Amino acid sequence: MEILNEPSSTYHQPVLLEESLQGLAIQPDGIYIDTTFGGGGHAKAILAQLKRGKLFAFDQDEDAESIASTWHDPNFTFIRANSRFIQRFLAYHQIEKIDGLIADLGVSSYQIDTALRGFSTRSEGPLDMRMDQSSSLTASQIVNTYSFEALTQLFRTYGELHSAPALAKALIAARTKHPIETTQSLKEIALPFSPPRKSAKFLAQVFQALRIEVNDELGALKSLLEQSLQLLKPGGRLVIISYHSLEDRLVKRFIKTGNFEGELDKDMYGNPLQPFVPVYKKAIVPTEEELVINSRSRSAKLRVGERTAL
């Protein structure tokens, strides 16, 4: 394989890389999907283990597409699209079943470090937060147009913030004076509602809530998980790396029951139908050694499910 542009450590240091590869249990002639190509860290490692196998990588970010365009490997196909459309594109490539699927749900280091993207609480930039820069909804539009009720629900549900009503009220008061257009403006409005000595975590939750709404991240995750049911062969592996409790709860529940309600379906005789078997009893977290190398992996949790014959 010829890769003209190595995945930059500043773009995305692959999180839980060895654990992900072990979870996928890669077969040299298997078919694999990386639904979050990013800087290509996981994808490169998967390709290195394939001989006649295929890797299809998805990402809606144009910067990820730029990196993928420099890869020249007959076993690799990059598709610039949201993971909601995996089945559609695989059907186009005449792929019905796959051996493994991996998704790293984190924002890439490159996206965080690029102030113009508006993801970081530490950089001054426009309040954007779009993963797909061709989409229309931005974080600025949300804080400047959503109603009190909608903002409260957003920060309470996606940010898990007790101060959601007060923050929503403050945003509405501030926007009557001038539009809220930058990350710094948002921080100045939000910080007074932070618990003592927890401002960094609080701001991260505020930004998380807006990012989830802008990109419909939980909706995309649900779609991805549901598609995995249809795509994975018996014995195929589902590997998901999540970064906050909302994602992790969805993934844990889905691997355990095959749905989002948390109860196993049953056949006509009352026997439980379990489409996945958890490979590990608990989520895998980064080692201390990895945390030293990549502090942004601190909140990562990896779960692996193996598709049954149901």
Curated annotation (Swiss-Prot):
Keyword terms, alphabetized: Cytoplasm, Methyltransferase, rRNA processing, S-adenosyl-L-methionine, Transferase
Entry annotated with the keyword Oxidoreductase: no
Domain of life: Bacteria
GO CC terms in record: cytoplasm
EC number, as in UniProt: 2.1.1.199
Matching InterPro entries: RsmH, SAM-dep_MeTrfase_MraW_recog, SAM-dependent_MTases_sf
Predominant location: cytoplasm
Enzyme class at the top of the EC tree: transferase
Ligand binding (S-adenosyl-L-methionine): G40, G41, H42, D59, F89, D104, Q111
An annotated GO BP: rRNA base methylation
Subcellular location(s) per record: Cytoplasm
Catalyzed chemical reaction(s): cytidine(1402) in 16S rRNA + S-adenosyl-L-methionine = N(4)-methylcytidine(1402) in 16S rRNA + S-adenosyl-L-homocysteine + H(+)
Signal peptide boundaries: none
GO MF annotation terms: rRNA (cytosine-N4-)-methyltransferase activity
Disulphide bond pairs: none
Keyword Chloroplast: no
Biological function: Specifically methylates the N4 position of cytidine in position 1402 (C1402) of 16S rRNA.
Matching NCBIfam families: 16S rRNA (cytosine(1402)-N(4))-methyltransferase RsmH
HAMAP family noted in UniProt: 16SrRNA_methyltr_H
Protein family membership: Belongs to the methyltransferase superfamily. RsmH family.
Protein name: Ribosomal RNA small subunit methyltransferase H
Protein species of origin: Amoebophilus asiaticus (strain 5a2)
